[in-house]
Regions:
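Hydrophobic/aromatic-rich alpha-helical bundle segments in the mid-to-C-terminal region
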Residues: 98, 111-188
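Generic hydrophobic, amphipathic alpha-helix propensity
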Residues: 5-16, 30, 55-59, 63
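Solvent-exposed, amphipathic alpha-helical segments
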Residues: 12-20, 66-69, 142-149
């Protein structure tokens, strides 16, 4: 399937942000990067704010799609635990796109759009956090930590092992950990 110009612009903006940060992103550099005229970029996104809104919407759609794939069925038919497990699995197994971290950490007020998009998704899939057990809330923090570790660990030395991912999914479902998981690793 052919990529739309709008999608090309969003992807290009993320690639540039990954290299230079969102704060240095301009329509001119973006147009050159994606092979369009400045007017071609502005046709789809009249302002940088509209571009950032488009990026946030694209992330939200991608996150929803990944969570639905992990769920394997309609959201409306899933229990709360199934929704939380699916969202967790989609984050643990999902890809972090170039520029995703740059967008999250951008100093621009518009970067709040991505945080708002994530919070919207989390409310849809998790519900009220205060209603979860302490174990579940700690597991959700572990999901955030897993994502951050993968985003910043360029050496590939992070704790991204399947057993750890399975433990996080189990905890987020409200299950207590199996004692065998607490034995020290043979790795030094």
């Amino acid at each position: 399937m052919r990529t739309s110009k709008r999608d090309r612009i969003i992807t290009g903006a993320l690639e540039l942000a990954h290299c230079d940060g969102f704060d240095s992103l301009t329509f001119d550099t973006l147009a050159e990067h994606v092979g369009l005229s400045r007017g071609g970029v502005i046709y789809h996104f009249r302002t940088k704010t509209e571009l950032l809104e488009g990026i946030a919407a694209a992330f939200l759609e991608r996150w929803r799609t990944q969570a639905l794939a992990a769920l394997g069925g309609p959201l409306e038919e899933a229990s709360r635990t199934e929704r939380i497990e699916a969202l967790t699995r989609s984050v643990l197994d999902g890809e972090i796109l170039p520029g995703e971290v740059s967008f999250m950490l951008s100093a621009t007020p518009e970067a709040e759009m991505l945080k708002d998009a994530w919070n919207t998704l989390r409310r849809e899939w998790v519900g009220e956090l205060r209603e979860l057990t302490a174990t579940q809330r700690v597991a959700l923090l572990a999901v955030d930590g897993w994502w951050a570790n993968r985003a910043f660990d360029t050496d590939g030395l992070g704790p991204d092992e399947p057993a750890i991912a399975d433990l996080i999914v189990s905890l987020v479902a409200g299950n207590l950990p199996d004692q065998k998981l607490f034995k020290p690793s043979d790795k030094d």
